[in-house]
Amino acid sequence: METVEEFLAHSIKLEQEAALRFGQLADAMDSCGNKEVSKLFRQLADYSRMHQADAQARAGFRD
């Protein structure tokens, strides 16, 4: 990566993927009856969405 913009683009994609996968793990843990671990993965998904929003704001994304 050679520019901040390129770094932010990669960061946005990475955080999107992380939020999706953490959500899937939370669902899997929920279906196994492991509510505590499910809650942790949901929290991690929320953090990923927060990081994604921050990267998008820094990159100048607009809704």
Tell me the role of every PLM-derived stretch:
Residues 1-63:
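Non-heme di-metal
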